[in-house]
């Protein structure tokens, strides 16, 4: 762990562990979300997949690339524990092979390494989060390794925060500015 002084405050720096990036999937069949953590995955590999355009400006010797947008995806390899909600949800999709709108699931990506705690009484801690309309792209069910591999295509994402009570996140729309969170009115 490294210690440094910034603006009169002492801060510590350390590695951010895998438990600080937490995906949740909405397992509800209604409009009220029921967030369940994707717990038994052995992979959390987010690819940002920048979509670029190349411009061959007359003032430049060589063509130049610019990022037009991103097409992020989160790869998962879910170990098959039959009593886990994440397995039940994904296996239901494996069994039914949904397409179109039926392959979409709302996902929360919580970045627990980045938070803001209010000075209110009682204090409220907000964690950075994305709420995402995700397409679940099923890959491989491997019965030998007891896993289901799938990708979450992270389509429309909204930045905001979550609060957590008893391990259950609640989505809070709002904005982050210089490390502080302001909930929408």
Regions found by a protein language model. Give the residues of each.
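Solvent-exposed edge beta-strands and adjacent loop segments
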Residues: 6-81, 131-146
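Intrinsically disordered, low-complexity terminal/linker regions enriched in Pro/Ser/Gly
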Residues: 163-185
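Extracellular/virion structural assembly segments
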Residues: 61-129, 159-166
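Short beta-strand and beta-hairpin "edge-sheet" elements
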Residues: 44-46, 110-160
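Short secondary-structure transition/capping segments
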Residues: 14-18, 153-169
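Disordered, low-complexity tails and leader-like regions
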Residues: 5-6, 156
């Amino acid at each position: 762990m490294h210690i440094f002084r910034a603006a009169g405050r002492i801060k510590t720096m350390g590695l951010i562990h895998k438990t600080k990036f937490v995906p949740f999937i909405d397992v509800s069949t209604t409009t009220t979300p029921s967030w369940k953590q994707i717990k038994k995955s052995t992979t959390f590999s987010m690819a940002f997949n920048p979509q670029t355009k190349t411009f061959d400006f007359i003032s430049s010797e060589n063509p130049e690339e610019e990022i037009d947008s991103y097409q992020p995806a989160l790869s998962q390899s879910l170990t098959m524990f039959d009593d886990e909600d994440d397995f039940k949800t994904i296996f239901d999709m494996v069994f039914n092979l949904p397409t179109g709108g039926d392959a979409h699931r709302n996902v929360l990506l919580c970045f627990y390494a980045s938070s803001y705690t209010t000075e209110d009484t009682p204090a409220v801690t907000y964690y950075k989060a994305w709420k995402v309309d995700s397409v679940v792209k099923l890959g491989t069910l491997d019965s030998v390794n007891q896993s289901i591999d799938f990708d979450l295509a992270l389509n429309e994402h909204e930045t905001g925060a979550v609060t957590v009570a008893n391990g259950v996140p609640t989505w809070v729309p709002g904005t982050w500015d210089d490390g502080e969170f302001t909930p929408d009115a």
